[in-house]
Amino acid sequence: MKNLKRLGFAAMMIMAGATEMTAQDEVEATVSADVVNQYIWRGTKCGELSIQPTLGVAYKGLSLSAWGSTELSNWGGSKEFDLTLAYSTGGFNIGITDYWFDGGSTKYFKYEAHSTAHIFEANIGYDFGPLAIQWYTNFAGSDYKGDGDRAYSSYVELNAPF
């Protein structure tokens, strides 16, 4: 709990500094939170009633964001904390995300091979206007096949608004 308070205080200080810089350097700050009745990610149910806060800063196409999810209906339920570093210009975008899923006994700063609760994912994509494509691949962390080899799980997304 003490570490959580420190993390919250540090995030508030960073956001306060980013807000001050906005007028001078065009740094954009994002602070938001969503409440969802179910947390579903890529077709997988990851939780019930949850709050999902976001903090982010962006400057000239480069962005750093923190996103989390914790169940409100079950305090011992699923928790997730993600950090994303991304760059975009025109329709092109590229990024790296560190997903952390609370597995009960797995601590956030545990990065040991074959026992971490982190998954590291790279993404690249392009928005053509009427159609956007995005490719995601896990490249490190907890993403292994049954035989222990790296799985490099991948996900492709096509988006055509109508």
Q: Where in this protein do the model-derived segments appear?
A:
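Cleavable N-terminal export/targeting peptides
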Residues: M1-E28
